[in-house]
Amino acid sequence: MQRILDDSAKLEKLAGDFQFIEGPIWHPDGFLLFSDIPANIIYKFTSNQQVEVFRRPSGKANGNTLDKENRLITAEHENRRVSRTEKDGKVITLADRYEGKRLNSPNDLVVKSDGSIYFTDPSYGVSKDQEELGFYGVYRLAPDGKLTLLVKDLVLPNGIAFSPDEQKLYVNNSEAGYIAVFDVKPDGTVTNQRLFAELKDAATKGGVPDGLKVDLEGNVYSTGPGGVWILSPDGKLLGRISVPETATNLAWGESDRKTLYITANTSLYRIRLKIAGVRAGK
């Protein structure tokens, strides 16, 4: 862990009293965006450490990321869609249906260097009688708008991230308590699903595999029981960052991408690391 985290590094609480926050993403203009799902707000944490409302209502936004043009890509629970915020502030729908049926409640997403958007679609934001698909998928949205179902056999797919070379796709299977990994084929589809790591620890506080990110050396960071779990590229547990609340998601921040921002139930935290994270949108 000393290669990743200095002994003197301390977790810093930045803000609190939120309802349930998720989906942090660092914008290169120098601020962090994150979602408060039940409050129906996307917040902005500024360089002078102030919290401002970025968007209300947010469509009960959950996960956020950026595309190659630094436009905000959002998974919206309430609107059951993946949206994009244009440069003029207009919010447009990128995907809300698969084969004519409404998506469940898009949860988290990642953008590949070719511009395609990969996202998870569990049921956390809808009731059973609102579901139309009958499964919880992982999808690829191509730059031309074509939506492809990649995986439909995970219990509740959640956090999602690529390895630095984009040859592997990691997906958190939250309720089952593990991270799945897939090989990415040249056409963008995935194959060879297998177990990457289990994140189960009855001795710690609550939490399941939720948010997921990868650093430039291929180490995998996942929220889980007790805080943030850090795993080597081969799935070995390197260590954990303890968080006093249930951690939900995480994002690399600052210009060097060596600050790890962590959303927890009601609070926002950060800690400095030694290795930079993979840049959103590549």
Regions picked out by a protein language model, each given a short descriptive name:
Residues M1-E12, A39, E132, V190, ...:
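Blade/loop signatures of beta-propeller domains
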Residues K10, A15-F31, P57-E76, R80-R81, ...:
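Beta-rich, blade/repeat-based domains predominating
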Residues E12-A15, E52-P57, I92-D96, T148-K152, ...:
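Beta-propeller fold detector
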Residues D29-R56:
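Beta-propeller domains
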Residues S35, A75, T120, N172, ...:
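Residue-level marker for isolated small/hydroxyl-bearing positions within beta-strands
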Residues I37-P38, H77-E78, Y124-F135, S174-G177, ...:
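Short, solvent-exposed loop/turn segments at conserved positions within beta-propeller repeat blades
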Residues I41-Y43, R81-S83, Y136-Y139, Y178-A180, ...:
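A short loop-to-beta-strand structural motif that recurs across blades of beta-propeller domains
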Residues V181-T189, R272-A280:
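Short loop/turn segments immediately following beta-strands, especially the blade-tip
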